[in-house]
Amino acid sequence: MNAFASGHAAHPDWRMALSMAAAQVDSQLAPQAPPTLGFVYFSDHYAAQAEALLAALRQRWPGVAWVGSVGLGVLASGVEYFDEPALVLLLAGLPREQFRVFSGARPLSGFDAFSALVHADPATPDLGELLVELSQRTASGYLFGGLAASRNGMQHVADGVWQGALSGVAFTQDVAMVSRVTQGCQPVGPVRRITAAEQNRVQRLDGEPALRCLLRDLDVTLKEPRTLLPRLRSTLVGLSEETEAMLGRGAMFGTDTRVRHLVGVDPAQEVVAVAEQVRVGMRLAFCRRDAQAARRDLVRICS
């Protein structure tokens, strides 16, 4: 078989979608190399049938370990399904000793994890701390994955269907992978150093009130609320540690930059609040989502 076999389909009946996607997968599988690990992502139109879907996957491919998640939309090669009943499958023939599926009911203890694919319920209390703890259990500290998204239950799959907490699959260092990051953002002003901050409140940038810097970058004033509010809603914040390079080629964000939401401003104190705890010394640049920036990132990643 190829390194991976994939399939995808959309249909009001999850059984029909699974049948169509499975036919695509089976056409790529070689009988001498059966799959051992499967990934399933399904839109929330199938959320109520998640248990039945997993049972059907197990019946079709006995012995395969399954991980995955629900989402408002799912993607495959060259196609996206958003807010419609659809699913995506990916199967791999990895040696079983090179991975382990984990969940709250099946912890990672005793496994020599190097990296991990993680799915999580976004409503989980202290999720950030749980991810840090899991990262510390891997040799590389590298986690990738995402949050479940649904209007009908935040299911994630790890040899069972779970809600709450997190689950996924860990890999040994024998599983080689290439990882690239795209933020899809364009800075709208210079990189500045945080010189005064408290929790998630940025008070001063390069010694100047943070809100004053933001308004200058957006070319707007507090006296123009009709112009100001839409621009604030579309503005994000790029953050990096003092020792990390924030900008890469073409004045774009580097791979170590974390993009967070702007969650509020305090005109009286000229303070900006962001969706992350910040510290003096960190680097900050205001930014916005940008289609051309995303395209450039993808070209860079695929080059």
Positions of PLM-derived features:
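Small-residue-enriched flexible segments
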Residues: M1-A47, A56-R58, V64-A65, S69-S303
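Active-site-flanking structural segment that lines cofactor/substrate pockets
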Residues: L53
